[in-house]
């Protein structure tokens, strides 16, 4: 039989965990000093006053290389536990890991062929 009172702890936890961030934002908004001036409106460049416009545009190529790096970095994070327990796991897990490695490699070869990784 479904008893609703068994979930009292869950609802209490949900309400308390929702109220803590709300209270933190409200308290910081009340206690934070409000001071706006030219120092607050200028960008901070390693203690040096910026010359010219502080908003520079980056080439999209930097983001493409960063994205490829993040994909392979995350793949390494997922492959590490598999490598540590390689001797316990069977052949089927090895095939799954091989497929897991081949998918980003195929994607990288495709991006390379399309010219997404070319610098010029």
Curated annotation (Swiss-Prot):
Keywords: Chloroplast, Membrane, NAD, NADP, Plastid, Plastoquinone, Quinone, Thylakoid, Translocase, Transmembrane, Transmembrane helix, Transport
Spans traversing the lipid bilayer: 9-29, 64-84, 88-108
GO cellular component, one term: NADH dehydrogenase complex
Subunit field text: NDH is composed of at least 16 different subunits, 5 of which are encoded in the nucleus.
Membrane topology: Multi-pass membrane protein
Gene3D superfamilies: NADH:ubiquinone/plastoquinone oxidoreductase, chain 3
Family of the protein in this entry: Belongs to the complex I subunit 3 family.
E.C. code: 7.1.1.-
Lipid metabolism as UniProt keyword: no
GO biological process: one example: photosynthesis, light reaction
Protein name: NAD(P)H-quinone oxidoreductase subunit 3, chloroplastic
Job of this protein: NDH shuttles electrons from NAD(P)H:plastoquinone, via FMN and iron-sulfur (Fe-S) centers, to quinones in the photosynthetic chain and possibly in a chloroplast respiratory chain. The immediate electron acceptor for the enzyme in this species is believed to be plastoquinone. Couples the redox reaction to proton translocation, and thus conserves the redox energy in a proton gradient.
Ubl conjugation recorded as keyword: no
Gene that encodes the chain: ndhC
HAMAP family, per database record: NDH1_NuoA
GO molecular function, one term: NADH dehydrogenase (ubiquinone) activity
Annotated catalysed reactions: a plastoquinone + NADH + (n+1) H(+)(in) = a plastoquinol + NAD(+) + n H(+)(out); a plastoquinone + NADPH + (n+1) H(+)(in) = a plastoquinol + NADP(+) + n H(+)(out)
Subcellular location: Plastid, Chloroplast thylakoid membrane
